[in-house]
């Protein structure tokens, strides 16, 4: 696959990948950026508009995987996967989320980036697209000054799960990508981290 940053030029490909439902239930990858009240009032077109505005600012918000490694115009190429990744402070929900709670409450989180979400087109699932996106995300964050990348994956313990259970990624995928298990968060979730050069 070819990986590209989400920006104004690749926005049309993201819209086609997410479809009219905004990936899942009108989320448009805004869940981690909003309070519950903001999210509920924005489901659908409002979330889409807000996410589109973010993409057009050039702020780091994530990467797309395309089904070709050619130099096809990004407005015509078909995206097959997405990973949301940004500085941890950009995700207001993480301040309150048990799964993302730092081990040390006094830790300086400057330079920590968070991988919050994956979305892979149903026709591309099972082909390693999410793992390729995760590898690219670590490099991309490092190039932008991250010192640590963290995630909040699901521990499937070898069991099959539905795609709606896996949007955080799997623990195995993160560990295979060089992340360390920092802490278990309940029976199915984990906090993982990888220090980047």
Each model region followed by its residue ranges:
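Conserved N-terminal entry element of GNAT/NAT acetyltransferase domains
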Residues: 1-33
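Conserved beta-hairpin
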Residues: 14, 60-83
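Conserved hydrophobic beta-strand within the GNAT/NAT acetyltransferase core sheet
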Residues: 115, 149-151
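Conserved active-site alpha-helix within GNAT-family acetyltransferase domains
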Residues: 142-147, 155-184
């Amino acid at each position: 696959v070819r990986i590209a940053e989400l920006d104004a030029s690749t926005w049309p490909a993201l819209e086609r990948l997410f479809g009219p439902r905004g990936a899942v239930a009108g989320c448009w990858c805004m869940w981690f950026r909003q309070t519950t009240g903001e999210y509920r009032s924005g489901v659908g077109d409002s979330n889409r508009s807000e996410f589109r505005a973010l993409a057009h600012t050039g702020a780091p918000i994530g990467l797309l995987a395309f089904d070709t490694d050619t130099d096809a115009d990004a407005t015509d190429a078909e995206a097959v996967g997405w990973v949301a990744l940004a500085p941890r402070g950009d995700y207001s929900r993480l301040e309150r989320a048990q799964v993302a709670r730092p081990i040390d409450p006094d830790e300086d989180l400057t330079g920590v980036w968070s991988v919050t979400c994956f979305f892979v087109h149903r026709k591309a699932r099972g082909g390693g697209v999410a793992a390729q996106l995760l590898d690219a995300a670590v490099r991309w964050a490092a190039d932008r000054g991250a010192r640590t990348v963290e995630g909040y994956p699901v521990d499937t313990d070898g069991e099959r799960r539905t795609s709606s259970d896996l949007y955080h990624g799997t623990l195995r995928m993160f560990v295979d990508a060089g992340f360390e298990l920092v802490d278990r968060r309940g029976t199915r979730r984990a906090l993982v981290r990888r220090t980047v050069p």
